[in-house]
Design a protein with these regions (language model features):
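N-terminal signal peptide c-region/cleavage motif recognized by signal peptidases
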Residues: 27-29
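Short beta-strand segments of immunoglobulin-like
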Residues: 42-46
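Non-catalytic C-terminal accessory modules of carbohydrate-active enzymes
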Residues: 39-41, 77
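Boundary of Sec targeting at the N-terminus
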Residues: 32-33
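N-terminal secretory signal peptides that target proteins for export/translocation
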Residues: 1-14
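Non-catalytic cap/lid and distal C-terminal segments of serine-dependent acyl enzymes
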Residues: 47-77, 82-408
Length: 408
């Protein structure tokens, strides 16, 4: 083979190799683009101007499809969906009040989320799609959305907890304009059983609520700290050493080194050290839902002069050592240590002790027992009772109301 023939052969080989490589890359690129850029043809949910909402699911081989959502004021509702000739199932939910709604489909007996709706929340192990209905600025739906207002920042922060002997994660909201120069008050916002440091930011829409309240001048700019209330866990499922385990109330079996109440001062010290806070009682508030309301109640007795504002949302008030199978009412009437701690709380004169609960909440009896005892010993509090039960819809309302009462 002469030099000319060799060069032509080599060039031909290189050209073929380049062509095959280019075709392979084009194929891979097309595949990657399909995953990134393809848009589902099915629009779901479609929120109409009157607040009605159309939900759709393409399932041509399905026999029965229904949707279940919290479309009623205080309860979930299951609606049948209708199939067209192309196998597209749909239903239009009648006009809804301003609110954030959750829903999921049921296809031939199998619960599934809406593939046309990328917005999904996790509540313990349950995944649900969400959508928001708003009719005018300032209504509940508006307050749960991101609007054209100044936005605060949301950070996931790791802190050291000497009491629990672990490094733990929490979510911290800093208001728009926070620059490390001005000092701000702090609201500690606690989740319920099965939740974690993500719960209030995701299910509770805490950042959106605070952004909108502050922008409207209804709430003072404040830092909001959302810790993980499970003292035997470092962080939310998938965010620490055990890895991608299935979330659950008692999935992690290891015993905590201390209680949430006993370890809470670790959080306060970290926040006061790392943020520009008003590091005194007048600059601190605390509230929580369900278990977090119980933690708030316990901390108010354990540290009565650390916080000036307390909020119990559908709270589960209890006394660790005193309960032992007893009803709350009996403990309040007979346990002298509990009585002394409530007296100390009363005498500390907090600016606000706020209790909110739904009329059908299973913890209503316990909250009534606590209020009755407070009345008997002259412990001041504000009480709010509304429709509904132990649901996020109520807890978002309570946060909205409580935040407007703080630091004024």
């Amino acid at each position: 083979m002469n030099k000319t023939t060799f060069k032509q052969s080599a060039l031909c080989t290189m050209t073929k190799a380049y062509f095959l490589s280019a075709m392979t890359m084009a194929s891979l690129t097309a595949s990657a683009q399909q995953a990134i850029f393809d848009k589902l043809n099915t629009t779901s949910p479609e929120v109409h101007a009157d607040g009605s909402v159309t939900l759709r699911l393409l399932a041509p081989k399905a026999d029965t499809v229904t949707v279940t959502g919290d479309f009623k004021p205080v309860d979930w509702q299951t609606l049948p969906m209708t199939r067209n000739e192309q196998g597209l199932w749909s239903v239009t939910v009648p006009a809804l009040p301003a609110e954030m709604y959750m829903y999921a489909f049921n296809v031939d007996g199998v619960r599934t989320i809406d593939p046309g709706n990328t917005y999904v929340n996790r509540d313990v192990t349950t995944l649900s799609n969400i959508f928001v209905v708003s009719h005018e600025p300032g209504d509940k739906g508006y307050n749960y959305k991101s609007n054209a207002t100044p936005h605060g920042n949301v950070s996931k922060v790791w802190y050291d907890s000497p009491t629990l002997k672990m490094t733990r994660r929490m979510t911290v909201y800093t208001p728009a304009g926070y620059d490390g120069k001005k000092r701000y008050p702090v609201l500690y916002l606690l989740h319920g059983m099965g939740g974690d440091e993500n719960a209030w930011a995701e299910l509770g829409r805490a950042a959106q609520i605070m952004d909108n309240l502050i922008a409207a001048g209804k709430a003072k700019p404040m830092i909001v700290v959302m810790p993980n209330g499970n003292p035997n866990c470092e962080a939310a499922p998938g965010e620490w050493t055990p890895g991608l385990y299935t979330p659950g109330h008692w999935t992690i079996k290891q015993k905590a080194a201390a209680t949430m109440e006993d370890s809470f001062d670790d959080i306060v010290k970290y926040v006061d050290t790392h943020y520009r806070t008003i590091a005194k009682r007048e600059g601190r508030a605390m509230c929580g839902l369900s278990m977090g309301g119980g933690h708030t109640f316990g901390i108010s007795l354990l540290m009565p002069r650390t916080f000036n504002y307390y909020g119990l949302f559908s709270a589960a008030p209890s006394f660790r050592n005193a309960m032992r199978g007893k009803k709350l009412d009996d403990v309040l009437k007979t346990d002298t240590q509990v009585q002394q701690r409530i007296a100390a709380l009363r005498d500390s004169k907090p600016q606000l002790y706020w209790i909110g609960i739904g009329k059908t909440d299973f913890l209503l009896e316990s909250n009534n027992a606590l209020r009755s005892y407070f009345d008997s010993v002259g412990m001041p509090y504000e009480y709010y009772e509304n429709e509904g039960g132990h649901i996020w819809r109520n807890w978002r309302i309570y946060l909205d109301m409580f935040a407007q009462k703080l630091f004024k």
